[in-house]
Amino acid sequence: MNEPRGQLRAAQPADTAGYGPHDWVRTWTIAMDALARASVAAAAATAGERLRAQTADALAGPFADWAFVDLGDGPPRRAVAARRPDPRLATVLTAVGWAECPLITSALQHRAPLLASPVEGDSLLGRLPDGRAVIDVLGAHSAAVAPLVSDGAARGAITIVRCADSPGVGFVDLGVLSQIADLTCAAVARLGGR
């Protein structure tokens, strides 16, 4: 392709090929809105439980169909929020520990954010107590995890999941999720384990 000299052309990641300018604006707007909402949650939190719940709520909506925030010393505690709330399913999902979710445990072991788009392997996000795969129950097609690492130790993770009618999680989303994890870690340090 012949490009006029002196003009730069923005590269597009493979998972967003075919996006038009309006799609890029929408993607960035949604991501920045999620970052702003999570920043408010991190700044306003007065206890770990509130931080988990408010962060999950900040991410659910246009940024994620489902958001899980696993955080806590000792047994991890999970907050769950959804774009289209399903209180019964959310309650069941709080019982799925991060140790049962290969995508989350891998992110924690490597201390690095991970992206699964498309998700492969039905147990990637764990199984419900009745044996059904979380991925199947949610209808998930992509997910991303950012570990919560403070003082070199894994304190938890933030996971976002996108389902049927949502675009796949991409690298822009993963970068924003990593920033949100950093803000959440700063809030955890500020709260001092409360």
Predicted regions and their residues:
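A short, aliphatic-rich beta-strand micro-motif
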Residues: H141-V149
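Regulatory sensory and allosteric helical modules in signal-transduction proteins
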Residues: R77, P87-R127, D136
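Short beta-strand-to-loop transition segments that serve as allosteric relay/switch motifs
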Residues: D122, A157-G168, V172
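Signal-transmission linkers at sensory-effector interfaces
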Residues: M1-T46, A187-R194
